[in-house]
């Protein structure tokens, strides 16, 4: 059976892993201990119930394949070197390492425990704040403004944008 190693367990990586799970020997390499639904991360910063919902365990993702928690260090030919797992042989390699944005839009921590603590700290800070300044009126800034004003209607929110 064809061996496919996917580096990155975000939206793209898990989509490919699930699609190939029945037809290939799939290995998904991911640093984080859980899948993070980043689309809901801004809501989680203002709503404690959502903070638990954005973290989904990888253990039920694949029926046949496996998830290796580690960092891909190098690719040499058909071999992927992974921290904590050694070398993984692959016939095909998929790089699905995704993107990085600052917190609270994305959680870059490998441990969901640390990420949940950051969310809780952000929520507590928002509860105690009378006003908030959000720098950047792009998609994330506007969405975060909406989440904050919805969850904390009395909060004064200033959205700062450098461009016209």
Residue ranges with predicted function:
Residues 2-4, 63-135:
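FAD-binding core/adjacent interface of flavoenzyme oxidoreductases
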Residues 9-10, 86, 137-138:
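Short beta->alpha junction loops/turns
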Residues 34, 101-102, 140:
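Surface-exposed, flexible loop/turn segments at secondary-structure boundaries
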Residues 53, 73-75, 137-141:
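A general structural signal for short secondary-structure boundary/capping elements
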Residues 132-147:
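Short strand-loop-helix active-site module centered on a catalytic nucleophile
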């Amino acid at each position: 059976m064809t061996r496919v190693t996917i580096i990155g367990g975000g939206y793209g990586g898990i989509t490919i892993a699930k699609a190939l799970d029945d037809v290939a020997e799939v290995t998904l390499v991911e640093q984080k201990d859980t899948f993070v639904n980043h689309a809901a991360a801004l809501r989680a910063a203002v709503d404690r119930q959502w903070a638990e919902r954005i973290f989904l365990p990888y253990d039920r993702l694949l029926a046949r394949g496996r998830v290796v928690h580690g960092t891909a260090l190098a690719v040499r030919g058909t071999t992927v070197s992974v921290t904590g797992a050694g070398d993984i042989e692959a016939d095909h390699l998929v790089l699905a390492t995704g993107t990085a944005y600052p917190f609270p839009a994305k959680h870059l921590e490998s441990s969901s425990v640390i990420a949940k603590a950051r969310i809780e700290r952000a929520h507590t800070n928002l509860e105690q704040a009378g006003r908030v300044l959000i720098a950047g009126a792009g998609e994330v800034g506007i969405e975060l403004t909406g989440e904050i004003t919805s969850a904390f209607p009395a909060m004064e929110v200033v959205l700062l944008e450098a461009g016209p």
